[in-house]
Design a protein with these regions (language model features):
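Conserved beta-strand hairpin/beta-sheet module of binuclear metal-dependent hydrolase folds
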Residues: 275, 280-298
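N-terminal leader/linker segments that precede catalytic domains of diphosphate-processing enzymes
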Residues: 1-277
Length: 298
């Protein structure tokens, strides 16, 4: 472990995380899996203007609503609370309701119209005889917001099949412009500059791309009750721009060494003209010998 006296940069405590939940509502489209995304308000305190999946903070009422939800035998209390939070947020933000009647039939547009997005969610559903479909919500991934950011969340990315017969309607205050998009299409539009998405969304869409059907996604997540991946990314500078990395990527280790508390202060540029300080007593010296075996150099 690196001693604090060896660090090049002053340390600071990362902002605390807040528990939240988000859900990828999926459907099978003509060209493959499609995911429901919406644009965040331009005045939002976190990721303004970004296209995201519906979600938000977990409330105490979500944990108190277990008795109003179905659950899988293997589904933990934590995962059920997260699923209920995601169901609630999907309704409040997009008017999508993952719930059933006592006879097993799915909630209809008439059921949705009878509920208020502003009133307590679980109590309304109970009064209307609706049971939340927590058993239909699965854990895909676990993201923890990067340590350098001022607002941080500890958030599972959940997945569920979009209920048939329902259409998303944005609340026009937190979320706007709901759209169905294939993961590869969303990534291409982002690269073209017309569809802003943030790092965890990018990496999640990349990992969804190989799946050909919604069933394939849900089966992969149902294989066990653990996320398919967990990440708290790290950030540095590359060619003068912000660059973020997951744990399996080589720059992550260098960033963890130079900035263990996650500050975005270190430059990652690969250069051979002079040594690059990593710690007060450690430098990276790169030889200019690029090749198949050495990459950009050693």
């Amino acid at each position: 472990m690196v001693r604090p006296t060896q660090l090049l940069y002053p340390q600071r405590e990362p902002a605390p995380t807040r528990p939240a939940a988000t859900v990828l509502l999926l459907r099978d489209g003509p060209e493959g899996v499609e995911v429901l995304m919406t644009r965040r308000s331009m005045t939002a305190s976190f990721a303004p203007g970004a296209y995201v999946f519906p979600g938000g903070g977990i409330d105490a009422a979500d944990a108190a609503a277990h008795a109003q939800s179905t659950r899988r035998a293997s589904q933990s209390d934590l995962h059920l609370t997260q699923a209920i939070a995601a169901i609630r947020e999907s309704f409040e933000e997009l008017g999508v309701l993952l719930a059933r009647h006592a006879d097993g039939s799915h909630a209809t547009t008439a059921d949705i119209a009878a509920l208020s997005r502003k009133a307590p969610f679980a109590a309304q559903c109970r009064d209307k005889g609706l049971v939340l479909a927590g058993d239909q919500v699965f854990v895909l991934a676990h993201w923890i917001t990067d340590r350098d950011l001022p607002r941080r969340f500890d958030v599972p990315f959940l997945v569920a099949r979009m209920p048939q017969g329902q259409e998303p309607v944005a609340d026009e205050s937190e979320q706007f412009e709901p759209c169905w998009v294939r993961p590869a299409e969303a990534l291409a539009r982002h690269e073209a500059g017309g569809f802003f998405i943030i790092f965890p969304t990018i990496r999640t869409l990349q990992r969804l791309t190989p799946f050909e059907t919604v069933d394939a996604v849900l089966q992969a997540c149902a294989a066990n009750e653990e996320p398919l991946w967990t990440s708290c990314p790290r950030a540095g500078f590359l060619e003068g721009a912000e660059a973020r990395y997951m744990e399996h990527e080589a720059p992550y280790g260098e960033l963890a060494l130079t900035s263990p508390d996650g500050q975005m202060v270190h430059t990652l540029d690969w250069q051979t003209s002079q040594p690059v300080p990593l710690l007060k007593n450690v430098m990276r010296l790169t030889a200019p010998n690029p090749g198949v075996m050495t990459g950009p150099g050693t």
